[in-house]
Each structure stands twice: as C-alpha cells, then as structure tokens.
Amino acid sequence: KSPMDKEYFFNQYDENIRPYEVIKEIDGNTAKLKLKEPKYYSITISPSQYELKHIHNNPEKLRAFVREAMKEYASSFNREIGGRPIIVNDIKYFAKIEHERTFKSNDVAVRENKPYSKQIAHLKNELRKVERGEILGNTRQIENDIRKLIRDAPYKIRGQLIEPGMKKEGLQSHIHIIVSRKDASNTYSLSPGSKYIASEVEMHGKWVKRGFERDRFFQNSEKAFDRMFQYNRNYVESYSARKMLSKDPKQYFLSLRNLGIHEKKIAFKMIRNTGLQLPVLHLPQNKVGFAVKQLKKMIEAGIKSSSIGY
C-alpha cells in the first residue's frame, strides 16, 4: 500500500495514533453510561471535489481543517463545564483520513442502474445455460441484448455499469471522526444528537444550559475552511443553500436566478456536474414540478461540499 493508504488516527494535538489505542481510550471513557447509551458518536467530514482540488488533496491541510472544525464542534454545545463554555480540550476525539469511496446500494447511480443490472444478470445466467447445452438459445443475440442494456444504463464508469462496491472516481478524501460520548475528564456526557435546541431548563432549583447548535456547527465549519484556505465558496456549495433546497425548493431556485452572472455560471456548472441537465424554461406547468423534484434530488446527491454527517 502507498503511504496515503496507511493513515493512522489523529486528534487535536497528536498524530500516528494506532487503532488499538483509539479503542482503549474510547472504551475507558464511559463512566456512568447506561448500557443502551452509545460510547461514541461518528462524524464524517466530506469535502467536495472542488474543495479537495483547491487544497491539492493535501492531508496536512485536511488535518488542520478537522482540528479547526472540532473547535467549532465544542463551541456549538450550549453547555458549561465548571461554569465556563465547552472548549475543544474537553472533547475526546480521534479522526482518520480515508482516500477512497465505493458505491453503496443506496447511491442514486446504483438505484437507477438496478433494473438494468437485474436484466443483465438474468441474461448472463441464460447465456451460461445455453453454452452448457441446458437450454436452446442464440448466444450472439443474448450477448447483443446484454451490450444494449449496458449502453442504455444511465450510470457507467469507463463502460462498466456502476454497482455496489465499485470505486468512485476522482478525489474522494474524507474524514471519519469518532467522538467520545463523555468529555475528556470522563465526567460529563456530551451529545451532539441532543433533541434539545440551545436553551436553558430549571433542574433541582438551578438553571442549566442544554442542547447542541447544529446549524452553527455546520456554518462555522464551512466558514473556517473558506478562511483557512481562501476558498471562494459558490452559493450552491453553502450549507444555507442546501438547507433551503431541502425546506423551500422554490426559494432556492429564485436565489439561483438572482446570483451574479459569473457566480450563476459556476453554480449551474456545478449542478450539471451532478449528472442532470437543467430543466428548460417555459415547461408546461405539470412538468415543472417533476423537473424541480429531479433537479433537487440530483443536487442533494451530488453537491455535498463540506458535508458533516452523524
């Protein structure tokens, strides 16, 4: 394997942390957790290919960004420890850079190829039976039918149908982060999945802060990347745009139309790179909704700049 394939874990201050050390640290940091409570949370940071290209896919820059993002993670807790806000030193985490991704069964390309894959598998099985003399059939015709199905399938890489397990092309570096449920002192339980938004509640006669501000974490992490690497983020790459696309597609498209000429050109190029032609203007009204839904689906699948998931 190349050195890039031999990435170890790192945290805020240390590097080259071995997997067994990570397991030991996480397993040993679970004081007073109930049996059904998770020992840790998983976060994935997935810079887009545009962002990776901008930083030349540099692992050092990715590590630097993760460390900055984890500062934002800590400050997004609406909690206090010893009367002070939570800081990154209170968070026990371990991160690892991965450089490859494979297609999964729930990826758009795999799902939309599935009907073709099924027919091809059936025909290949039939072809083998004909070749073994188990059934009568025209092998040349079956082979032609297989080639046609491959040709007609919507998603391919170098002529091959995209299927689960196939490696994705292009820059695919992403970071997996394991964050202990308990703080670094093994005293306080910290959950980014808290159902409570940032608020205060009275407990045992005292007002206690609680909650985790997800929007703040996403937006500030995005700003940190842009600030650190002088990245000029396009509207369609922004967290606020992705959120608007999910909640109010009509407003999202209005915002796209109102972009400056240069930014709009780049935005539409990014959208086209997700694999869908933009809907033409002046579509009959009954087709507009369909086009918007299809475009929305493809943008969500294809544009995940600095996406951070749990």
Language-model regions: role of each:
Residues 1-310:
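N-terminal nicking endonuclease/strand-transfer module with a His-rich metal-binding environment
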